From Swiss-Prot:
Gene name per UniProt: PGRP-SD
GO cellular component term of the entry, any: extracellular space
InterPro entries: Amidase/PGRP_sf, Amidase_domain, Peptidoglycan_recognition, PGRP, PGRP_domain_met/bac
Subcellular location: Secreted
UniProt cross-references to Pfam families, sorted A to Z: Amidase_2
Source species: Drosophila simulans
PANTHER family per the UniProt record, alphabetical: PEPTIDOGLYCAN RECOGNITION PROTEIN, PEPTIDOGLYCAN-RECOGNITION PROTEIN SB1-RELATED
Function according to Swiss-Prot or TrEMBL: Peptidoglycan-recognition protein that plays a key role in innate immunity by binding to peptidoglycans (PGN) of Gram-positive bacteria and activating the Toll pathway. Has no activity against on Gram-negative bacteria and fungi. Shows some partial redundancy with PRPGP-SA in Gram-positive bacteria recognition. May act by activating the proteolytic cleavage of Spatzle and the subsequent activation of Toll pathway. Recognizes S.aureus PGN.
Keyword Signal applies: yes
Endpoints of the signal sequence: 1-18
Protein name (database record): Peptidoglycan-recognition protein SD
SUPFAM superfamilies: N-acetylmuramoyl-L-alanine amidase-like
Length: 186
């Protein structure tokens, strides 16, 4: 490799350092929305942490299957136009793209407006997500501020604070209360 090739490789590494890789809708084979989705103006004032309350996943194939299953359930049984969350975090430490942050979510009833929905795939009532998943979520929150999806002083909330639910599970809820931007109030 020439010095120019090394320079290009080095600059590319610098450009992507600190960016959370996101598994796109095309990569997990999402269906298109089946109806209109209201838009929201970004940056948003809140990030809401949830869990899907179902099975967990630890590899790319299983996590993508969980994404398709959740989307199918939310579109057919819950009658959402698309998957309800903006981002989901797998046990493989990867972030999965849900709906656009500029589209109103479908996870917190009247509190969807102004909220970025981030759900961990699995049930975290008794056990917290693994370190890889937790680190991915923290990096995603930082990246969302840098990309003007969240305001710099956003409020971090648990799903149970904005909706009548046990989500994000007791173990995960206890952890996120220690994260930057945690807020007791909406």
């Amino acid at each position: 490799m020439t010095w120019i090739g090394l320079l290009i490789v080095g600059l590319t590494a610098i450009a992507v350092q600190g960016e959370v890789p996101i598994v796109t809708r095309a990569e997990w084979n999402a269906k298109p929305p089946n109806g209109a989705i209201d838009s929201m103006e970004t940056p948003l004032p809140r990030a809401v942490i949830a869990h899907t309350a179902g099975g967990a996943c630890a590899d790319d194939v299983t996590c993508s299957q969980h994404m398709r299953n959740l989307q199918n359930f939310q579109m057919s049984k819950q009658k959402f136009s698309d998957i309800g969350y903006h981002y989901l975090i797998g046990g493989n430490g990867k972030v999965y793209e849900g709906r656009s942050p500029s589209q109103r979510g479908a996870f917190a009833g009247p509190n969807n407006d102004g909220s970025l929905g981030i759900a961990f795939i699995g049930n975290f009532e008794k056990q917290a997500p693994n370190k890889e998943a937790l680190d991915a979520a923290k990096e995603l929150l930082e990246q969302a501020v840098k990309q003007a999806q969240l305001v710099e002083g956003y409020k971090l909330l648990g799903h149970r604070q904005v909706s009548a639910t046990m989500s994000p599970g007791e173990a995960l809820y206890a952890l996120i209360q220690q994260w930057p931007n945690w807020s007791e109030e909406m």
